[in-house]
A protein has these predicted regions:
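Short catalytic/metal-binding and nucleic-acid-binding patches
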Residues: 1-152
Length: 152
């Protein structure tokens, strides 16, 4: 099961440091570098989650998370711990991931820059997955046309 996550900063005007059309991703600010570090660390921390794709934008982050199968099985092949296969459990695991991510980042930032809520979307099929991968990949290009984009 895969989920697409959007986490906003709550900072409406946080321009990138370079023209996004000249690079595959906007140059990361100090905040972006810290966010990148914790996305990678938390990817290793959560047993049932892997970060498949992500992009750090000037005022938000998109993540595509994959819920992994539990490899901790009993002799008869049953899971020892519940695998997040239903929607409620999947959203709970993602909420934990996002909450931990924001807490770690905010501690290092010395301030809270994240919006309280985030948006999630359960990936329903292969086409839905590919659409979200494409969206994440193309998001830096679309940023140039965003109403919040500003040039320095």
């Amino acid at each position: 099961m895969a989920l697409s996550i959007f986490v906003g900063t709550g900072v409406p005007d946080c321009p990138s440091e370079t023209d996004v059309l000249d690079c595959p991703q906007p140059e990361l600010t100090r905040y972006g570098e810290i966010a990148d570090k914790y996305i990678k660390q938390l990817n290793d921390f959560y047993e049932h989650l892997s970060v498949e794709k992500y992009v750090i934008m000037p005022n938000h982050i998109h993540l595509l998370l994959w819920l992994k199968e539990n490899k901790n099985k009993t002799d008869n092949g049953q899971s020892r711990t519940p695998v997040p296969t239903n929607i409620e459990r999947a959203k709970s695991v993602c909420s934990q991931f996002v909450s931990t991510f924001k807490r770690f980042c905010n501690k290092e930032y010395g301030e809270n820059i994240w919006q309280a809520r985030f948006n999630d979307h359960i990936i329903r099929n292969r086409d839905d997955y590919e659409e979200h991968v494409k969206y994440i990949y193309e998001n830096p290009i679309r940023w140039y046309y965003d109403e919040l984009y500003t040039e320095e």
